[in-house]
Design a protein with these regions (language model features):
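Structural preference for beta-rich elements and adjacent junctions enriched in aromatics
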Residues: 1-183
């Protein structure tokens, strides 16, 4: 897949898109429509694509201030995870979050592209599989979390996650609870 941020191409249309984004720390919360993601790999890199539609009442300038945070725990132990913060302006940052509080630098380069347009934005993140530490022979499974940060942090309903963690500290490695298996 290309890193243009355009997720309407054939490569993305064939994938399974997940849409059950809900508010963290609210087990009774209903999914909020308008956010979905897909994941793929090509043997060399892992790709995440996210589509974010403007929510009811969301102004264009609010949409432009959003970001998506993707957390990957390739060791599946909840001790450390890569976190990738992806912005609408095409910029991204990456780090390693530690469960024992603290951060380390992400040692590698990632690819990123975004596309902001009226009514929504989309993004594609590319992480080389060689940069993901793992505990077994070959990288076969990862745990992950995808979060959409909507408005100023701390505002009501400012965060949607898939899967929704049990607490609001979504960047904690122990909250990477979704699991993907490579075929």
């Amino acid at each position: 897949p290309e890193l243009t941020g355009d997720v309407s191409t054939d490569a993305w249309a064939k994938l399974l898109w997940h849409e059950q984004f809900t508010t963290p720390a609210r087990p009774d919360a209903q999914p909020t429509p308008g956010t979905s993601f897909a994941m793929a790999h090509d043997g060399d890199s892992l790709f995440f694509a996210v589509k974010c539609k403007a929510l009811a009442g969301e102004a264009p300038e609010e949409l432009a201030r959003e970001n998506v945070q993707i957390q990957l725990d390739s060791e599946r132990r909840g001790l450390r995870s890569g976190i990738f913060v992806c912005y609408t302006d095409g910029k991204a940052s990456s780090a390693i979050e530690l469960e024992a509080d603290g951060k380390e630098a992400w040692l590698g380069e990632v690819g990123y592209g975004s596309r902001l347009q009226a009514g929504g934005w989309s993004m594609v993140l590319k992480v080389p599989l060689s940069q993901l530490a793992h505990v077994e022979e070959g990288l076969q499974r990862i745990q992950f979390n995808v979060s959409r940060v909507l408005r100023a942090h701390g505002a009501p309903n400012s965060l949607l996650s898939y899967p929704a963690p049990k607490n609001i500290h979504f960047w904690r490695p122990s909250n990477a609870t979704g699991e993907a298996e490579f075929e």
